[in-house]
Amino acid sequence: MKIGIFTLPLVNNYGGILQAYALSRVLVGLGHEPRLINLRLQRSKLSIAYIKFLVACALKKELCGAKFNPSYERDTSEFVSENIPLTAPVCTPADLKALCEKKRFEVVILGSDQVFRPSYFADFADCFSLGFLPPNCTRIAYAASFGGDRLCGLKNPADLKAHAANLAKFKAISVRERDGVKLARECFGVDAHWVLDPTLLANKEIYDKFLSLAPQRKGFAYILDPSPRSEAAIELLKKQRGERPRQPHRHKSMVKRYCGRGVCANRLISRLRIFHNL
């Protein structure tokens, strides 16, 4: 079955890249032919919300001692082109509609990642509910996320009504966070199921080709939002193991130590190796 995957432009977000990779591999394993719809954004037209998001990430890295590496964009682009099946670049909503008509996808999957946050789509903000698809194309949302505890970026009641009507045409809708079930009902009037993120849905074998064993197995903590509770858990692990777990940004040399053979040329792959070598 020919399946299109419609998610946020991948930019340099390794989490977004990995979820797209994982979902495409799961679909291939089920015997389908997936293609990620290759949304391309002109830097001058990135949404204010997404620019703020990228700036916040950069500031967080700077404050934590991480250095900006201009090769990161090249590395992530290389990973995407080599490991995720892509369509031709799509630069405008008109191009998007034309591509889907040409490819004749039998199914288009919305997700994963924060696809229910339309401002993150920039020029494609009005497309997240897949209203551009022909009537005979099956629509599915998998592990979609609102990116928070409320709907952001839709203030016009008419726009909200139009997107709700589009989402009502979906054969199935699922969300990444438990709160998303309630938000989907309140915001769009649709029923949604709570499911695994694609990175956890896939078997570990899809990551094996990127991984190499480190000389030693050590503790590793990946904390999105540090809190007293998470710090207490880390301290407990420190007492049990006799050393503090490594954390991204907390220790500059963390990637080098965990990759076994030095820093991998592709930092996204380095991250995978870190998780594998625990």
Feature-to-residue mapping (PLM):
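Acidic anion/phosphate-binding donor-loop and adjacent secondary structure
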Residues: R150-K155, L200-L213
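Nucleotide-sugar donor-binding and catalytic loop/hinge architecture
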Residues: M1, E101-R104, L133-N136, Y207-K218
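Conserved acidic residues
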Residues: R104-V107, K171, R217, H276
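Catalytic donor nucleotide-activated moiety binding site of glycosyltransferases and closely related
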Residues: I140-G148, D179-A184, I223, S230-R271
